[in-house]
Structure formats: C-alpha cells, structure tokens
Amino acid sequence: MTGNGLVERFDAPLSGLAVVGGAVRGLLRKTPAQPVLPRRTLRREAVLEAQAIEAYARLCGFSPEQGVPITWPHILSFPLQMRIMLGADFPYPAVGLVHVHNRIRQTARIEAGQRLNLTTRVGSLLAHDKGQAFALTTEATRDGQTVWEGKSIYLKLGPKGRGATVPELDAPSGASVLETWSPAPDLGRRYAAVSGDANPIHTLGLGARLFGFRRPIAHGMWTKARAIAALTPQAPLETAEVEAVFRSPVFLGDTIVLQAAPPVRTNNLFEVRDMGGTRTHLRGRLNLSPSLSSQPPEGPSS
C-alpha cells in the first residue's frame, strides 16, 4: 500500500547532517503495524563526470576500455534512494535495512560528459521469509529517451512480509572458478569515497559490530560491479541486463571466488562464493542481449 503522491527535485548532494538527522528520526519512530509506503517521486539531473567514473571503475575492476560501468547510474541515484528512506513519512528506519536484490538494465550506450535525468520512485511491499521487503525503482533518461532502469529491493528484518515474493535466482550449472578476489580491509572506506555510501557496517569495525558483524563487510553493489567487470567484454556496453541476489555478507579480508559457466552467454548465471565453496555471497544473472519485451523494473503500485 502506498500513500499520497509527491514529486520533488533534488540536484544538491545529500549532506552528512541530513543523513544523521534522518537516521536518528527513523530510529526514534515506531514502525506502524500496517506500514504505508509514501508515494514519492524524486528527480535529479546528473552529469557523467569522467574523473568520478574513472575512480569508481578502477576500484570495481573495470578497464578503461569498458567505458561507463552499467552500475554507475545506480550510484548517481543512491542519494535519491537515501532521501526517500530517511524521510519523515517513511515507515522503516534506514538504519538496519538490508539490500537483498538489485536489477539493472541498460538500453543504450552511456558515455562520460553526458547528462542524465534520474527519477526514483517508491515501489511496492514485497514478501520475504526474513521480514518485510520493499522496492525502489529508478529510470534514467537522456534527451527524453530511457537509457537505463534499476530496481533495488531492501529488507526490514522481522516477521515474514506481505506482497509478491522477492525474486530468487537458480545456481549456475557446470560453473567453474573464473577469478579469485581478496577485498582489502580498507575497501569499505574506499568504496564509500567513490560511491557516497558510507554505511558504517562497511567502513568501521565498531559500526560493523553494532550490527552483529565481527568486522566490516563489503558493499553488495561493489561485489556485483566487480563480477560485471569480469564477465562483460572489454568494450562499452550497448545493451545489457544484470540481476543479483545478495545472499550473505562478504567480510573484508576474506578470499572469495567468482564462478560461472564460460563463455558468457544470454541469461548466463553466476555466483560469488567463499573460497571453500560452502557459502554463496551473491547469485546473479547476466544478459548481454536483453529482450525489449521482457519485464522492466517495477514502478509504483498500491
């Protein structure tokens, strides 16, 4: 269920004071028995700045030949997502929400120097075994044409939620190890610097321990981006769709492996697992030729 609609424009960056204030308000506010998601639409214009893109791409393993990473518009839309989740009308505290699913689709090449208009909306409530999930969707347009779409699903831990079930993905069949990574202990701070996501569970030992983690964990979107960098061609993407389910945290300093069944093909499934192969951190699906008739990321609903 969603509330009344509001359309707002935010081109200024989200300040640290706004983040702290919104987080505190959320923690002090009691979650209602029947949560109502605000029907909000937030917009901003963003310039694809080459220096910022290069710093992000390098940290995530993209080569210069791959151009603007398909995940970069998600980074540009993150301040809009945070404004929604930190809002006084949002039923859940932003602190403690878990990013459990992300799907992005690019329908045209995106290049540095271009301007994108980003529109982020609140989607619907979704059912998850570990609590109540909800969706936030983003559309990026260039000269009035949609060139990128994204959908992120977040989870509020608690009793099983209501709504349509959060999507899952099958494990890849016949997969082998393609790459091995060891995320450095300072990766969380470095990723926060290039992405704007400074969640303390990724950047501080104390912040991680306060939420039950023995040490900081990698950002899920870094893990997804790192996998995309390894699986996609050494050339800018024209069209692609990448879906990921975040299944368990990656502790910084641990060794993890990327598994897939080469060669990469339409609807190729992949996984990021621990070195021993006993724990799945991320399960994904890559489609380098997405059909225009496939289902786009969901918009707002009631």
Task: Give the ranges of each region predicted by the language model.
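Hydrophobic residues on conserved beta-strands that form the core of alpha/beta folds
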Residues: 39, 149, 239-241
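HotDog/MaoC-like acyl-thioester-processing domains
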Residues: 1-37, 79-82, 99-183, 249-252, ...
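Catalytic-pocket segment enriched in acidic/His residues
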Residues: 206-257, 261-263, 272-277, 283
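Hot-dog-fold acyl-thioester-processing enzymes
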Residues: 1-101, 161-234
